[in-house]
From Swiss-Prot:
Pathway: Protein modification; protein glycosylation
Membrane topology qualifier: Single-pass type II membrane protein
Result when mutating residue 346 to K: Reduced GlcA transferase activity
Organism the protein comes from: Cricetulus griseus
Function summary: Glycosyltransferase forming with EXT2 the heterodimeric heparan sulfate polymerase which catalyzes the elongation of the heparan sulfate glycan backbone. Glycan backbone extension consists in the alternating transfer of (1->4)-beta-D-GlcA and (1->4)-alpha-D-GlcNAc residues from their respective UDP-sugar donors.
Glycosylation sites per record: 89, 330
Transmembrane segments: 6-26
Protein name according to UniProt: Exostosin-1
Source species taxonomy: Eukaryota, Metazoa, Chordata, Craniata, Vertebrata
Gene3D superfamilies xref list: Spore Coat Polysaccharide Biosynthesis Protein SpsA, Chain A
SUBUNIT field: Part of the heparan sulfate polymerase, a dimeric complex composed of EXT1 and EXT2. Could also form homooligomeric complexes. Interacts with NDST1.
Length: 746
């Protein structure tokens, strides 16, 4: 028994010694190898590897949390080839591994929200018109601040758009100029806009200076160099791209079937040599001269004749036969191949023309790909499968083509029709990254009216907006809040405001009534107000200005708002009918008093008219129903300059609201019934409400029209000839068969 114990102890000791020798030898060899590498690197002056690189394997899980610069310098691993090391060191962006979590300071945005600071322009620095438009769009936005201490994001005033060294717009010595900025901080929380980078012959994406930890809003950026959740891919746009507004899409009506004269078209340069030449040189294989027109020309550049091939003369001749605009507007699909760079002007041209883009640019990070689902608006092709493009697009069902075409128009008008929209979309994407808890989802970005008009600060629930009831399977609100704007003192029980209050309160759809007291006289006593079945809340305006009627009051508990002037004359039946109509069109303004706009050729300006014509483009908010979200948009989206103008004139607030809603919906308001007179004509002439009789009042409204159109960059108002009346309205049938029979007597 004792012998067995001795043998067991001896065997255990031997095993321990063997294990100790084995692990000790491995560690000794590793340390010797490590010391030799250190000695070798020391002799060659190489960077000493960090001790963190020799942590045990279980530390690999901590890799995502390493500092970005430490990860960036990890080029001394034993498994990295010399070629990989050279490629890493020659990367166009030294901060290639930057992400919002590692290269952005969120603390700057917590205190003052998302504010953007633009550096003051330096004397003697040339700035291209396109970059001036970008800076103007930022400075005119609600994000702009002139105080750098309040800023969350910084934008250079130095022109970084064109970094092609052969371009006359190229800014020299940009590296030293940027480094001298006292707020640069290695680019942290900075945004750099760029359209062109690199030059002949390779057109790399190097912008020519160290961007540090700055974000890039860049055109023609490749997926290889694009830093997800950090950079923003923007479209390539020309110097003639409008600063604000922009033309609407060219799709005026939907044709069924949605096929045009040409199936697939392209007209552009053919590069005979160099980068981007492979695809365009092969387009002639697909061109059939009938419904597939892919036209190229060799006539560009100074030395094109030196490189011309046997096809150039034939291509040049056929190229001149067709008008590009005619092709563009009569084609179902438009080919968008890469050029010298990945992006192309053809991309935006196809979107505007409702020609479905067929992308043929491998490795291009499509514009705003972080939020836009391009599969709903474009066909993503592969340069290597060029010959399969015709058969692929011919196999697309007509229903799908119609949906693609409609989506091109939405995306064009929502995000691409002006420099301002491109810039604001870029800023909104960055803001969503910072405040992820209230960021917009894919449905908002890819469905009308788009991410620029749906402000997540209002609500994180889509059902609180008037645009998504059908998507969510929700019914429109069943109740409304009446908001009566009172500006005259209450001196008689027969005043129109009291009659209006009683009529609105009797509506079966009325939840409450809010009286906004903007009168200079003190509030009347409670017993002066009539008794009603619904609550009546009187709010005394602090500033007593016109814009206060559109403030997003917390007292408004319903989504629907019935906006009323104090001298409006409406019956309960008229209120009920207008509300039932609004339930079918919750995103629009629905009401009674209609007005119109027109273009005055003699004065070359917009005009305003209250004449009774066969069409209208505005429904005044003195007797109208709309969604309360427009109160929030009016207050937080529109610039202070327009609201200050309205307050100073005590006029035009209803016109501005119509501009806003039409700009959002791209639709006209809706007039109900043929009622024309909606004002009480017996109001005292000493009251503020008699401003309608003031001769200057009409002239002011003419001026407002042009000021508003100037800010929007275009005329958003849309004419309509539709009027909605009750079923059987004035038909020769029994009055008992009519639901809104009282309307016929009014």
């Amino acid at each position: 028994m004792q012998a067995k114990k001795r043998y067991f102890i001896l065997l255990s000791a031997g095993s321990c010694l063997a294990l100790l020798f084995y692990f000790g030898g491995v560690q000794f060899r590793a340390s010797r190898s490590h010391s030799r590498r250190e000695e070798h690197s020391g002799r060659n002056g190489l960077h000493q590897p960090s001790p963190d690189h020799f942590w045990p394997r279980f530390a690999d899980a901590l890799h995502p949390f390493f500092p970005w610069d430490q990860l960036e310098n990890e080029d001394s691993g034993v498994h990295v080839s010399p070629r990989q090391k050279r490629d890493a060191n020659s990367s166009v962006y030294k901060g290639k591994k930057c992400r919002m979590e590692s290269c952005f300071d969120f603390a700057l945005c917590k205190k003052n929200g998302f504010k953007v600071y633009v550096y003051p322009q330096q004397k003697g620095e040339k700035i291209a018109e396109s970059y001036q438009n970008i800076l103007a769009a930022i400075e005119g936005s609600r994000f702009y601040t002139s105080d750098p201490s309040q800023a969350c994001l910084f934008v250079l005033s130095l022109d970084t758009l064109d970094r092609d060294q052969l371009s006359p717009q190229y800014v020299h010595n940009l590296r030293s100029k940027v480094q001298s900025l006292h707020l640069w901080n290695n680019g942290r929380n900075h945004l750099i806009f760029n359209l062109y980078s690199g030059t002949w012959p390779d057109y790399t994406e190097d912008v020519g200076f160290d961007i540090g930890q700055a974000m890039l809003a860049k055109a023609s950026i490749s997926t290889e160099n694009f830093r997800p959740n950090f950079d923003v891919s923007i479209p390539l746009f020309s110097k003639d791209h409008p600063r604000t507004g922009g033309e609407r899409g060219f799709l005026k009506f939907n044709t069924i079937p949605p096929l045009r004269k040409y199936m697939l078209v392209f007209k552009g340069k053919r590069y005979l040599t160099g980068i981007g030449s492979d695809t365009r040189n092969a387009l002639y294989h697909v061109h059939n001269g009938e419904d597939v027109l892919l036209l190229t020309t060799c006539k560009h550049g100074k030395d094109w004749q030196k490189h011309k091939d046997s096809r150039c003369d034939r291509d040049n001749t056929e190229y001149e036969k067709y008008d590009y605009r005619e092709m563009l507007h009569n084609a179902t699909f438009c080919l968008v191949p890469r050029g010298r760079r990945l992006g192309s002007f053809r991309f935006l041209e196809a979107l505007q023309a409702a020609c479905v883009p067929v992308m043929l640019s491998n490795g291009w990070e499509l514009p705003f790909s972080e939020v836009i689902n391009w599969n709903q608006a474009a066909v993503i092709g592969d340069e290597r499968l060029l010959l399969q493009i015709p058969s692929t697009i011919r196999s697309i069902h007509q229903d799908k083509i119609l949906a693609l075409r409609q989506q091109t128009q939405f995306l064009w008008e929502a995000y691409f029709s002006s420099v301002e929209k491109i810039v604001l979309t870029t800023l909104e994407i960055i803001q969503d990254r910072i405040f992820k808890h209230i960021s917009r989802n894919s449905l908002i970005w890819n469905k009308h009216p788009g991410g620029l008009f749906v402000l997540p600060q209002y609500s994180s629930y889509l059902g609180d907006f008037p645009y998504y009831y059908a998507n969510l399977g929700l019914k429109p609100p069943s109740k409304f809040t009446a908001v009566i704007h009172a500006v005259t003192p209450l001196v008689s029980q027969s005043q129109p405001v009291l009659k209006l209050l009683v009529a609105a309160a009797k509506s079966q759809y009325c939840a409450q009534i809010i009286v906004l007291w903007n009168c200079d006289k003190p509030l009347p006593a409670k017993h002066r107000w009539p008794a009603t079945a619904v609550p009546v809340i009187v709010i005394e305006g602090e500033s007593k200005v016109m814009s206060s009627r559109f403030l997003p009051y917390d007292n408004i508990i319903t989504d629907a708002v019935l906006s009323l002037d104090e001298d409006t004359v409406l019956s309960t039946t008229e209120v009920d009918f207008a509300f039932t109509v609004w339930q079918s069109f919750p995103e629009r303004i629905v009401g009674y008093p209609a007005r119109s706009h027109f273009w005055d050729n003699s004065k070359e300006r917009w005009g305003y008219t209250s004449k009774w014509t066969n069409d209208y483009s505005m429904v005044l908010t003195g007797a109208a129903i709309y969604h309360k979200y427009y109160h929030y948009l009016y207050t937080h989206y529109l610039p202070a300059s327009l609201k200050n103008m309205v307050d100073q004139l005590a006029n035009c607030e209803d016109i501005l609201m119509n501009f806003l809603v039409s700009a959002v919906t791209k639709l006209p308001p809706i007039k109900v019934t043929q009622k024309k007179q909606y004002k009480e004509t017996m109001m005292g002439q000493t009251s503020r409400a008699s401003r309608w009789a003031d001769p200057d009042h009409f002239a002011q409204r003419q001026s407002c029209m042009n000021t508003f159109a100037s800010w929007f960059g275009y005329m958003p108002l849309i004419h309509s000839q539709m009027r909605l009346d009750p079923v059987l309205f004035k038909d020769q049938v029994s009055i008992l068969r009519k639901k809104y029979r009282d309307i016929e007597r009014l």
